[in-house]
């Protein structure tokens, strides 16, 4: 379920005060199509299109203007239709994907792009809280491609994915392709315990289905 609110339709009348337009949409989660991701991991690609800099549009505001992210996604999927795009900023640091946040793990330290430069997704926040409760070391910092290519583990978070492991970044395989890695698996279990649903099993139960 998604809620969208706009400022309403503008009028030429001087004293016109627009009233908000409210839209509520529902979308079916593509369980069958995504189920394999929990066995094989996501193939993550960083397109050449950079994320719009925060000085132009703050990424912390959920404006539903996804054009920049969609263009990056289209570029990534032109070379790999199953790829998930995460855009870099103008300095070559990771930002976010369309509706997703990215995490990397190196030497038992969990890192994610600074919340000042991404939309602070609800699932992202939950994962940071879970990591703190589990006593894991967490950093919000600049993460470049070298960090990604040398990571021990990686995963994406989103409302529908929850936590999904990453198999590779631009073709560079993470953790010899073993997914999920141990810390990712620990966080996935903690997330399932928190929400009261084994979301991985929920996805995997659709493996034999088609959508």
Residue spans for each PLM region:
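Phosphate/pyrophosphate-binding loop motifs in nucleotide- or prenyl diphosphate-using proteins
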Residues: 3
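Helix-start/capping segments and mature chain N-termini
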Residues: 6, 11-211
